[in-house]
Amino acid sequence: MVNTGEIKNLEAIDIVKLLSVLPHRYPFLLIDRIIEIDGDRKAIGIKNVTVNEPHFVGHFPENPVMPGVLILEAMAQTAGAISLLALGRGKEDLVYLMTIDNAKFRKPVVPGDQMRIHVQLLKKRSEVRRFLCIAEVEGTRVSEAEISAMVVKS
């Protein structure tokens, strides 16, 4: 069988596979697994939010809330991972965030939450991709944004 570089309907991508694809590491690796994937068209990533994460020391000590910018980064990492996987590329290549549009934060994400990050490809042109991203906790939308990113060979 010829490898086209396209991944279709994989059941899950665990943390070991994510570490082989993404260059991010603790404390900036913000997805724990991808539970559903359909090539670079759509995926659902998981972020298990724990009180041990360093940003909770200062955001906010008495009432910890995951910073919105880190929710956006988790979305970008999920989109980046499926882009690299679909192209058959790994952490030697990079995905650069280009734009964030229409970002909305509807509810706080707190320690103990499991955030599901839905990403859907809206447009693809050469190495540039645009995704609709929706983050949910227990089925409730907590954030959404459209992001554009570029896959770059290192």
From Swiss-Prot:
Catalytic activity: a (3R)-hydroxyacyl-[ACP] = a (2E)-enoyl-[ACP] + H2O
GO molecular function: (3R)-hydroxyacyl-[acyl-carrier-protein] dehydratase activity
Pfam families given in the database record: FabA
Keyword Transcription regulation recorded: no
EC supergroup of this enzyme: lyase
Gene Ontology CC: cytoplasm; membrane
Record's subcellular location: Cytoplasm
GO terms under biological process: fatty acid biosynthetic process; lipid A biosynthetic process
SUPFAM superfamilies referenced in this protein's UniProt entry, alphabetically: Thioesterase/thiol ester dehydrase-isomerase
Active-site feature positions: H59
Keywords associated with the record: Cytoplasm, Lipid A biosynthesis, Lipid biosynthesis, Lipid metabolism, Lyase
Catalytic activity, EC: 4.2.1.59
Recorded family membership: Belongs to the thioester dehydratase family. FabZ subfamily.
Functional summary from the UniProt entry: Involved in unsaturated fatty acids biosynthesis. Catalyzes the dehydration of short chain beta-hydroxyacyl-ACPs and long chain saturated and unsaturated beta-hydroxyacyl-ACPs.
Protein name: 3-hydroxyacyl-[acyl-carrier-protein] dehydratase FabZ
Species this protein is from: Bartonella bacilliformis (strain ATCC 35685 / KC583 / Herrer 020/F12,63)
Lineage of producing organism: Bacteria, Pseudomonadati, Pseudomonadota, Alphaproteobacteria, Hyphomicrobiales
